[in-house]
Every structure is written in C-alpha cells, then in structure tokens.
C-alpha cells in the first residue's frame, strides 16, 4: 500500500510540475492563443483544462498502480528468498531475477550479523538476570543464616540459662521438706522445665546445626547422637555402618538427620529415637525412628516446614523420602540415596 501511494504521488508531482512549468512559459514568453483557449474550449461539456487534469490523474493512477504492483512483487520475492536462505534452502536464479538475487544476498549478509548480535545480547541479558538472581539468592541465604545464628546465641545465653537455673532451684526446693499441696506441685514444675529444656535444645539444633567439617557422615551422626545423649532425657541410640559416602550427598543427609531428630525431640513425646545408616550395595539407607505419639502424615505434611525441608534435600541428591507415622505407634523416616560405585572405585 505504501509503494502504491508513493508511486501515484510521484507521478502526479512530476506531471503537474511539467504542466505548471509549461503554462508559466506560455504566460510569460509565448502567450499562444491555443493555451488561452484551453480555459474556454470544452470536451464532453467539460473545460479542456479540467478534462486534461482528470485525464492526467487517471493516467497517474494507472501507471502508479502498475509500478507499485511490480515493486511489491519484487519485495515479496526478496523476502521469500531471504527466508529460504535462512532455512538453508536453494535460491532460484535466472536472467530476470539475477539483480534481485544480488540485492537479496546483500540484505541477507546484513541481517545475519544483526540477528547473531541480537541473539548474543539476548543471551547476555538472560545470563545477567540469572547471575543477579544467584547473587541475590546467596545474599538472602547468608542473611537468613546470620539471623539463625543470632537467634540461637540469644536463646542459649538467655532462655536456656534461665531454664537451667530454674531446674537447679526446683531441685534445691525438692530437697527441703514442703507441706502439701506444695510438695505435689514440684514434680509438675520439674516436668515443665524439662520439657522446656528439651524444646530449647531441639530449637538450637534446628537453628544452629552442626556441620560435618572433615568428618564422614557416619562419624558426624555418631558425634551428634553422643552429644544429645548427654543433654536430653530421651534415649538416643544409633546403628551406623562404616562405608564411604559420596561427598556431594553427605551434608544433605546429615542435615536431614538433624532435622528429623529435632522434630522428634519437639513433637514426638516419645522416650526413644533410633538413627540407622546402612549400605545396601546400590544405595544407602538412612532411617530415623521414634516410639512417640505419631501423627497423620497427610494433614501434618502440608503444615510442617521441617518435613518439607527434609524432602527437598532428599530430592536434590536424587534420593527418595518416605515417612510412615501412625497415632500412638511412632514415626519412621527413611531416605534412600543411590551410590555411584564407579565414582567411588575411581576415587580409590
């Protein structure tokens, strides 16, 4: 449409420019009677001057339409050849389109670098976005970790110490002879303080988890269990097989163990928790089991951040995560992680 309008406009401008110049020459220099008569002579009842104008406009429309059609054909051919070239198809050449083909190739060679540069800039923008996201993610994790450490220190230095002091005071009061009903309230208070201390230790374990550092997974779990045996009234036992665990999954499995024990201490109301780690040739089995009150897994899972976090850690290392719990029958968590024997043997 644009080519059509431009062609007609160009023809009209050209013809009318010639006509005005011709009339100007006649008026100033020649003043021929023939041109004066153009304003008075009629054709089909129309003055000759007006008739000629209509004829010129009609001719310009016809000629401009033909030119615009040919230009559009050429442009369509050029676009089709560019598309064929981009798709790797053969471009047809003959005597009529050799010039257009040359123009097409020139345009193609101009567009290819521009397209490559556009793709490069698009990928660079995407990479910058990903890098910015990763940087922000690292910063957020660092802020969260620092805040967890701060909360753990405050809990340990204030609430934990106060609970310990309350426990010592209750023990001293218990040694003295109290009249009923005060002597009957002391055991209740002791139980409340012990439960609070247990909750506090579970929170500290959750907020400030112990890292493996240079220890193996088995050694880390053993040390964790031994440390808890000294601090919590619940019986904590372990059965750990000594075998090499890939370094890439050790930390995740250790964090899962900590999270599971923390949840057990806080919510199970049980008297015993067992941690087991076995080598099953193609995979390892990590099991944490307690004899507590249990719960409805479907209802609890959607509300528990700890359970979701354990499952996410398991999925990150390609492991399966299963949890079985029944009311008054305890809870069992099992994680099965594949062992890459080829990597382990090559590492030896």
From Swiss-Prot:
Enzyme class label: transferase
InterPro entries assigned to the protein according to its UniProt record, in alphabetical order: HATPase_C_sf (IPR036890), LiaS/VraS (IPR017202), Sensor_HK_TwoCompSys (IPR050482), Sig_transdc_His_kin_sub3_dim/P (IPR011712)
Membrane topology, from the record: Multi-pass membrane protein
Domain Histidine kinase, residue spans: 150-341
Highest taxon, organism lineage: Bacteria
Keyword Transmembrane helix: yes
Keyword Ion transport attributed: no
Protein name per Swiss-Prot or TrEMBL: Sensor protein VraS
Native organism: Staphylococcus epidermidis (strain ATCC 35984 / DSM 28319 / BCRC 17069 / CCUG 31568 / BM 3577 / RP62A)
Gene name for this UniProt entry: vraS
